[in-house]
């Protein structure tokens, strides 16, 4: 068993894609399509570059393990991709790669985040051994394109004058999450959209959507309502607006929430 100093991005993407299709190996931060994974690794993975953010373990010249850290250099934190391991001595390989990658990152990472399928028992045990704290459990819902287009009252794309209210609500509802309010504003683009529900110039709620048309991928990243606007149908209207927007893209068939 050895770690190679020469990394091949296509090999990494292919290995993760195959492993991530299996619930017992699944990591929620990454998909299971090779081309999409390769694009993410090369263009949207880790502030320190993908080469410094992965370790790959081999045995008899075959990959048996991949571990990646999607590093945020400013926050000194990382989302954990893996460990993806195809070996009998799973824990031994996992701890070996963890040690190697920790030493490879050029600074101390203060916080790690894991997001694993409920059937991924190996990674759950590893997190426990590393003294990780479980923050919560989440369901991923998939919606198919059967939505009719219609006008939704009081919901529209966020304008700059609403950003301050949005940041305050978002940071209050999600105090320790992967994107703070100002980071979401910075990520807005022709495809990444923030929709808000307003009443009397007050923010009732919002939904933030990211779309990658190239891979026909869409995610509703955040949805929340202000405390005094709950149980009034605001969340439902926001969700409808987000779904309609996503399915307005040609070829979009399903959404993950």
Name the predicted role of every residue range.
Residues 37, 151-218:
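Flexible, substrate/cofactor-facing loop regions flanked by secondary structure
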Residues 133-145:
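Conserved catalytic-core motifs of GNAT/GCN5-like acyltransferases
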């Amino acid at each position: 068993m050895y770690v190679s100093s020469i990394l091949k991005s296509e090999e990494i993407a292919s290995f993760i894609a195959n492993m991530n299709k299996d619930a017992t190996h699944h990591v929620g931060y990454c998909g299971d399509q090779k081309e999409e994974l390769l694009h993410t690794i090369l263009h949207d993975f880790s502030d320190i570059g993908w080469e410094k953010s992965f370790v790959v373990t081999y045995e008899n010249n075959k990959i048996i393990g991949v571990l990646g850290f999607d590093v945020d250099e400013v926050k000194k934190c990382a989302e954990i991709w893996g460990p993806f391991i195809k070996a009998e001595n799973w824990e031994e390989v996992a701890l070996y790669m963890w040690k190697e990658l920790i030493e490879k990152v050029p600074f101390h990472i203060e916080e790690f985040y894991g997001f694993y399928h409920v059937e991924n028992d190996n990674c759950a045990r590893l997190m426990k051994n590393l003294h990780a704290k479980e923050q919560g459990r989440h369901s991923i819902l998939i919606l198919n394109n059967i939505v009719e287009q219609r006008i939704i009252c009081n919901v529209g794309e966020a304008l700059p004058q609403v950003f301050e209210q949005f940041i305050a609500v978002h940071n209050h509802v999600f105090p320790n999450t992967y994107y703070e309010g100002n980071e979401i504003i910075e990520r807005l683009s022709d495809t990444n959209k923030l929709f808000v529900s307003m009443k009397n110039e007050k923010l009732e709620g919002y939904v933030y959507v990211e779309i990658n048309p190239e891979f026909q991928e869409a995610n509703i990243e955040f949805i929340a309502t202000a405390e005094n606007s709950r149980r009034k149908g605001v969340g439902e209207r926001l969700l409808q607006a987000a779904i309609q927007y996503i399915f307005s893209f040609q070829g979009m068939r399903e959404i993950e929430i």
